[in-house]
Amino acid sequence: MAEIKNIEVGKFYLIHDGSKTGHPGFVVWKDDNANRYLLVLTESDKEGNVSKRSADKRHLTDLDYPTEDRIVKSYIKKRPMLCKRKDIGICLLGMKFHPNDYEKVKFVAKQIPVNGPSLRK
């Protein structure tokens, strides 16, 4: 998966999590110098396929609106995914959270410490 050089907070990117296609992730926090990024994941991949792991609804908070037609259902993990730049692939253009869901996204972002969480090597 191609690595992206300029990652922006508030945009969707494809996250490589071991699956063949990856999953859309919304960046809520970043530290370019430390190469650390925190993302909120959605349930389906770019093609709209729901991952098997996401069928387990524990520890998930549903959003009220899908991000776009191809995404069947979106959610916010209570502990968003922390990753390095190499784990972030192609930017997904045209994906946006519904305005009514922004409060949930901001709530997740506010739970992140100012210096960001620790990242295992």
Where are these regions (language model features)?
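Compositionally biased, intrinsically disordered low-complexity regions
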Residues: F12, P24-V27, V50, C91, ...
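C-terminal terminal-subdomain/extension
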Residues: R58-K121
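A short, polar/charged loop/turn motif at coil->beta-strand junctions and beta-hairpin connectors
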Residues: I7-V9, N33, R70-V72
